[in-house]
């Protein structure tokens, strides 16, 4: 029943028939409108604050990005300036060398002289007249502003015609220079394309060419050489297939690239400005690319970055493939040369063995006769050597006896010298030992005195540390006591300002004294003039005089020093006897 009465249809029925329900109160639409307006204003102000915060954050982010860009630009400017100076110095040193027979250097010097002459003529015929015209126009403008003449209109028309004529001439000159620049850029691009094609041919041709080392080698076994060449062709075909895959991949990446050649050159130059170890490098160069290419979205730039990474990765893989091929080719050639040389050596050995067998049989007979003759000679030589060695042994025994006698005499003399030397050495050692013992006793005394001083210092430092710790403890106890006293005073103040009035509905609903006075109820018949209107709770005379600030000021006035700098500095530093309450302290001058 309650659910049925609370349904929307019943509520609509009650509202149409003006049948009130005790559960619902009448709605104050004006109050609701005021609340909604206040909410709208609060939400609008919050929205405005959020927008301002977003704008300030965006501006600060933009400023930080520009600051980082400036740092990178300055570093890049310094680097490019150093490179430019280095290249100019190298070019000058190259051109200044005495290369009489070098026609290329002579052509370069002539071309440099021709360019300098063209620059001088351009400055003389184009830039200097423009600067003179500009200075003349500034002078005329300044002159006409200061002095007014009747023929100003005629002169201004003439000047405008002259300026238009100069503009047309400059336009034709700039157009001619632009065409010449475009022609030179096209020539340079053609040469760069030729150089790239030549480099690609140099990269791809070595894979298809047969090495000279394998062609020049001769092998006595033709089957072995043909098998080595077929193995080399299989080896190169595998690498050629991989290289063709990389070339196709590079062509696909170049075809899918959305930027033109000039835009890609700008893109690469911007990326080269920011070093790889820079913090936030990708954010910085993407921001700079969006500034350079406002017609391109961030998605397009990221896609181009992905294509460039793929292109760079493919180039690196291609270079790795070519380096691996060169390395494997060298290894293969070394192995092939080694096998062919071994085959040639074995073939030569086989042919030499066949020849050596015949020679060996012929030499065997000659060797047998020579061996017999050699044995007879050897026996005679051995007999003669034994006789000679016996004679020499007798002579050596006689010499050894004489040498032993001399050695015994020399040893006796050496023993005497050694005894004298050790006596002197022992005396020196005793003197050194006595001197070292005296020095040791002196050092021990010094160390004992120093240790005594160190103990006294340590004891003094310990006493000083204990005194400081006691002072810190006393300060901590004093602070704790002050905190307790402060809490007690705050509690007393809270009790003083606490609400003590009891709930009195009769007094609340009755008339006040002011309303009674207005209506003439309970009015006193006589007005006592001496009666104070209000009760004042102020300081008495004794409390005012006991204030140290007043007493110090009176003393300064009596001495005539109340207007000096000393009084101005010392009076604000004097604190009252009782510090003021924190809730009564003024904060007007602290804002």
Curated annotation (Swiss-Prot):
Keywords: Coiled coil. Residues 166-195, 352-417, 466-498 form a coiled coil. The keyword Signal does not apply. It comes from the Eukaryota. Transmembrane segments: none annotated. This is Coiled-coil domain-containing protein 148.
């Amino acid at each position: 029943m309650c659910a049925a009465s609370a349904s929307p249809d019943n509520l609509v029925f009650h509202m149409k028939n003006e049948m009130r329900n005790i559960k619902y109160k009448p709605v104050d639409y004006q109050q609701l409108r005021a609340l909604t307006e206040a909410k709208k204003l609060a939400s609008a102000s919050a929205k405005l604050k959020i927008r301002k915060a977003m704008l300030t954050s965006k501006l600060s982010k933009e400023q930080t990005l520009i600051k980082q860009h400036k740092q990178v630009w300055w570093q890049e400017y310094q680097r490019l300036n150093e490179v430019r100076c280095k290249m100019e110095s190298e070019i000058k040193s190259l051109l200044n060398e005495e290369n009489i027979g070098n026609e290329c250097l002579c052509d370069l010097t002539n071309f440099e002289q021709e360019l300098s002459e063209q620059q001088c003529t351009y400055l003389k015929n184009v830039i200097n007249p423009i600067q003179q015209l500009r200075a003349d126009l500034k002078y005329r403008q300044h002159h006409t502003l200061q002095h007014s003449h009747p023929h100003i209109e005629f002169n201004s028309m003439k000047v405008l015609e002259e300026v238009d004529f100069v503009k047309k001439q400059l336009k034709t000159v700039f157009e001619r220079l632009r065409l010449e620049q475009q022609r030179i850029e096209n020539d340079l691009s053609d040469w760069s394309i030729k150089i790239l094609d030549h480099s690609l041919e140099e990269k791809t041709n070595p894979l298809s060419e047969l090495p000279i080392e394998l062609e020049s080698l001769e092998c006595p076994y033709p089957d072995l050489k043909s098998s080595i060449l077929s193995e080399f062709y299989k080896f190169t075909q595998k690498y050629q297939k991989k290289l063709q895959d990389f070339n196709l991949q590079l062509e696909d990446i170049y075809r899918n690239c959305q930027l033109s050649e000039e835009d890609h050159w700008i893109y690469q130059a911007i990326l080269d400005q920011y070093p790889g170890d820079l913090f936030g490098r990708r954010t910085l160069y993407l921001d700079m690319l969006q500034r350079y290419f406002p017609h391109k979205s961030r998605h397009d730039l990221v896609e181009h970055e992905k294509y460039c990474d793929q292109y760079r990765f493919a180039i690196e893989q291609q270079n790795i493939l070519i380096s691996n091929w060169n390395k494997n080719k060298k290894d293969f050639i070394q192995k092939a040369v080694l096998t062919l040389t071994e085959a040639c050596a074995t073939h030569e050995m086989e042919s030499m063995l066949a020849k050596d067998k015949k020679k060996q049989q012929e030499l065997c007979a000659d060797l047998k006769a020579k061996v017999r003759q050699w044995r007879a000679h050897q026996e005679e030589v051995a007999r003669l050597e034994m006789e000679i060695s016996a004679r020499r042994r007798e002579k050596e025994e006689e010499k050894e006896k004489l040498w032993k006698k001399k050695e015994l005499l020399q040893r006796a003399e050496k023993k005497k010298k050694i005894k004298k030397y050790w006596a002197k050495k022992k005396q020196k050692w005793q003197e050194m030992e006595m001197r070292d013992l005296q020095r040791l006793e002196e050092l021990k005394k010094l160390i004992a005195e120093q240790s005594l001083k160190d103990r006294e210092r340590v004891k003094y430092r310990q006493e000083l540390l204990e005194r400081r710790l006691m002072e810190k403890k006393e300060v901590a106890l004093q602070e704790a006591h002050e905190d307790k006293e402060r809490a007690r005073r705050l509690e007393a103040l809270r009790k003083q300002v606490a609400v003590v009035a009891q709930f009195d509905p009769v007094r609340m609903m009755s008339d006040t004294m002011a309303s009674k006075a207005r209506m003439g109820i309970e009015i006193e018949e006589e007005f006592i003039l001496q009666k104070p209107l209000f009760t004042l709770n102020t300081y008495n005379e004794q409390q005012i005089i006991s204030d140290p600030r007043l007493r110090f000021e009176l003393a300064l006035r009596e001495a005539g020093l109340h207007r000096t700098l000393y009084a101005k500095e010392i009076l604000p530093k004097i604190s009252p006897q009782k510090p003021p309450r924190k809730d009564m302290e003024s904060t007007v001058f602290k804002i």
